[in-house]
Amino acid sequence: MKTDTPSLETPQAARLRRRQLIRQLLERDKTPLAILFMAAVVGTLVGLAAVAFDKGVAWLQNQRMEALVHTADNYPLLLTVAFLCSAVLAMFGYFLVRKYAPEAGGSGIPEIEGALEDQRPVRWWRVLPVKFFGGLGTLGGGMVLGREGPTVQIGGNIGRMVLDIFRLKGDEARHTLLATGAAAGLAAAFNAPLAGILFIIEEMRPQFRYTLISIKAVFIGVIMSTIMYRIFNHEVALIDVGKLSDAPLNTLWLYLILGIIFGIFGPIFNKWVLGMQDLLHRVHGGNITKWVLMGGAIGGLCGLLGFVAPATSGGGFNLIPIATAGNFSMGMLVFIFVARVITTLLCFSSGAPGGIFAPMLALGTVLGTAFGMVVVELFPQYHLEAGTFAIAGMGALLAASIRAPLTGIILVLEMTDNYQLILPMIITGLGATLLAQFTGGKPLYSEILARTLAKQEAEQLARSKAASASENT
């Protein structure tokens, strides 16, 4: 009697068939869904990292304030503690960068732009811990820096980390996940998903390879990072300035004048940043000890200012609603503006791990408020609010400096929830961008990247000459 024939398909063959079906699904319609899945993973990790970074900075700042409270009865001791706390935190950040990952210094956005062009390395195993903990030190110490620089660079490096862990190959996957991580980092830093998308498309337009896959991945990454941010921080505008009145049509010409002012100041500000970089480099000369001590002095100065004049230190998010509400006199606004220009130049140009978006938003707000106070006095018949010019000015300096008007406009709208001011903001941003371009100003990040690449080329040339000289001896 014949026994039943067993199934010819072994368990191993069944597993292989299932894997093949899954692979066909992932590659259906020539759409590598694996990249989109990785984009979701990247966005989730970036959102969590941004939340952890934000909470860490806030915790360090609170600890620093508590230390000052305990010495409030002794004024000389209070000033000493204010200086030392910030100096030590800053020195910690400078030391990590200089010792372990020099590319983690500064904003980090030019590094991502260079990586997208295959001109800069992405050493995520070094950059991630150095940028995270170094940024905690400098921002937690009250330096005039923004959180977006660290989160964008951390995001791009997380994209590369995920690529390496899952062993995805190909330039498209590498480029897409780098861009996705960077966009997710900006979105999570400001709770501004649309600004994160526009940042990649506009600011990184020379480097971003716009394809259907890459833009889908950026969308997915930004969505996931924003969800992570809002889970821990609720769905509220990052900066609460209240609902401001709309700008009447017969006052729009005033916003064009404001844009012209920023169009003049933006290129000048960029030159000051680059000039301060050269000056501070001459001070430390590349010596790690001098560089760390210099950073400690700058950090300590910011710590003192944070106690004596709080509006002149820190990223500036606490300053923006106060200035927009008109709580400063004209003289105080001028003082804050001058002081913050100096501290922004010192902190950012020194190579501290931190961004410049937030300080520029604060500078734009202060200058916009001052302009608004002037026009309110000059044109009482218009019944204007100085706060509307503050909001218009927030994104105008970004537009003039980094040449990204759309990103600046949408970023401010998402952060303040004042969408009714979109028309005056467009006029201000357009005026600032056109005049900055007309006067020959170049985007700040492009200038910094060009300097970095020139330095890299010089170092490679010096090493090759040294190697050839040693071979000849």
UniProtKB/Swiss-Prot annotation:
Subcellular location as annotated: Cell inner membrane
Feature type site, description Mediates proton transfer from the protein to the inner aqueous phase: E203
Gene3D superfamilies: Clc chloride channel (1.10.3080.10)
Topology with respect to the bilayer: Multi-pass membrane protein
Intramembrane segments: 109-116, 177-189, 193-201, 387-401, 402-404, 405-416, 417-421
Main location: membrane
Extent of motif Selectivity filter part_3: 355-359
Origin superkingdom: Bacteria
Site (Mediates proton transfer from the outer aqueous phase to the interior of the protein): E148
Binding, chloride: S107, I356, F357, Y445
Keywords of the record: Antiport, Cell inner membrane, Cell membrane, Chloride, Ion transport, Membrane, Transmembrane, Transmembrane helix, Transport
Job description of the protein: Proton-coupled chloride transporter. Functions as antiport system and exchanges two chloride ions for 1 proton. Probably acts as an electrical shunt for an outwardly-directed proton pump that is linked to amino acid decarboxylation, as part of the extreme acid resistance (XAR) response.
Listed PANTHER family: CHLORIDE CHANNEL PROTEIN
Quaternary state and interactors: Homodimer.
Protein name: H(+)/Cl(-) exchange transporter ClcA
